[in-house]
Amino acid sequence: MSKRVRSSLILPAVCGLGLAAVLLSSCSSKAPQQPARQAGISGPGDYSRPHRDGAPWWDVDVSRIPDAVPMPHNGSVKANPYTVLGKTYYPMNDARAYRMVGTASWYGTKFHGQATANGETYDLYGMTAAHKTLPLPSYVRVTNLDNGKSVIVRVNDRGPFYSDRVIDLSFAAAKKLGYAETGTARVKVEGIDPVQWWAQRGRPAPMVLAQPKQAVAQAAPAAAQTQAVAMAQPIETYTPPPAQHAAAVLPVQIDSKKNASLPADGLYLQVGAFANPDAAELLKAKLSGVTAAPVFISSVVRNQQILHRVRLGPIGSADEVSRTQDSIRVANLGQPTLVRPD
């Protein structure tokens, strides 16, 4: 397991190694049923979270999770020097020419929902990554050199800070690359120029508005207060919530009346489909904040598995569909596709 610590915190180590609140590979032996999976997980230390990390207890079809869409960043990037564990790092201002080969690890449930180094929220189902010196945000292509699989991720966090690890990926990204079970992989990391990426697809890069300075100023005190509260809390013993524990397989009953009551007229978009209902609800909440179109979850059974599909509609016109798709892509929430209502 790689060791990772958020640059803004100085935390005590787990497993009795003194300072530096990081996720320790030596702790992986305490998860006897899944030692291989635990071996590559890492994450930013946080007093308010349990000290063990891991994969979700439920199975996730990551093939349905789209890669991050490279978006031009209008405004300043987070590239200030910082010191962690006595070492000072000097982030780059531009990731486009970045090339590196090394070991990748991943981090998961412990940090799901927590703030990243640039103030975003870590989502273990998102296609994101942590890096020591790339600007935040930036985009990179990560290729597993053992199997040739490749993904695009948005870099929005700092780490990993120990051993030979060059990048930490989200659980979803690691699983798409085929190394979530083994923990680490030898990868190639390549910076992406968003403008060039869009040009290669015959489309101009979407315009992204910079965040108002007033909003940034208002968010700073709240973030500092949240961080202070987190640092005052002790490390807890990890006990997964009851809803996360594996449960017996029960017959699935879908509320067909609820699904059938949806309007049949108009156009519909689907942004994702999840085996985990919590993931569907999370995406639904995010989509509701970026589009005026109705967002709903339609559940179906496929191959003896329940799928919770996150959809939008009805949408009145093709032009409105196009604008809605662009808004969702700009927000980096997925690749919405047209579907028929059912």
Swiss-Prot record:
<keyword id="KW-0732">Signal</keyword>
<keyword id="KW-1003">Cell membrane</keyword>
<dbReference type="GO" id="GO:0071555">
    <property type="term" value="P:cell wall organization"/>
</dbReference>
<feature type="lipid moiety-binding region" description="N-palmitoyl cysteine">
    <location>
        <position position="27"/>
    </location>
</feature>
<dbReference type="InterPro" id="IPR009009">
    <property type="entry name" value="RlpA-like_DPBB"/>
</dbReference>
<dbReference type="GO" id="GO:0005886">
    <property type="term" value="C:plasma membrane"/>
</dbReference>
<feature type="domain" description="SPOR">
    <location>
        <begin position="261"/>
        <end position="342"/>
    </location>
</feature>
<comment type="function">
    <text>Lytic transglycosylase with a strong preference for naked glycan strands that lack stem peptides.</text>
</comment>
<keyword id="KW-0472">Membrane</keyword>
<keyword id="KW-0449">Lipoprotein</keyword>
<dbReference type="InterPro" id="IPR034718">
    <property type="entry name" value="RlpA"/>
</dbReference>
<keyword id="KW-0961">Cell wall biogenesis/degradation</keyword>
<dbReference type="GO" id="GO:0000270">
    <property type="term" value="P:peptidoglycan metabolic process"/>
</dbReference>
<keyword id="KW-0564">Palmitate</keyword>
<keyword id="KW-0456">Lyase</keyword>
<dbReference type="Pfam" id="PF05036">
    <property type="entry name" value="SPOR"/>
</dbReference>
<dbReference type="InterPro" id="IPR007730">
    <property type="entry name" value="SPOR-like_dom"/>
</dbReference>
<dbReference type="GO" id="GO:0042834">
    <property type="term" value="F:peptidoglycan binding"/>
</dbReference>
<dbReference type="Pfam" id="PF03330">
    <property type="entry name" value="DPBB_1"/>
</dbReference>
<dbReference type="InterPro" id="IPR036680">
    <property type="entry name" value="SPOR-like_sf"/>
</dbReference>
<dbReference type="GO" id="GO:0009279">
    <property type="term" value="C:cell outer membrane"/>
</dbReference>
<dbReference type="InterPro" id="IPR036908">
    <property type="entry name" value="RlpA-like_sf"/>
</dbReference>
<dbReference type="InterPro" id="IPR012997">
    <property type="entry name" value="RplA"/>
</dbReference>
<feature type="signal peptide">
    <location>
        <begin position="1"/>
        <end position="26"/>
    </location>
</feature>
<comment type="similarity">
    <text>Belongs to the RlpA family.</text>
</comment>
<protein>
    <recommendedName>
        <fullName>Endolytic peptidoglycan transglycosylase RlpA</fullName>
        <ecNumber>4.2.2.-</ecNumber>
    </recommendedName>
</protein>
<dbReference type="GO" id="GO:0008932">
    <property type="term" value="F:lytic endotransglycosylase activity"/>
</dbReference>
<feature type="lipid moiety-binding region" description="S-diacylglycerol cysteine">
    <location>
        <position position="27"/>
    </location>
</feature>
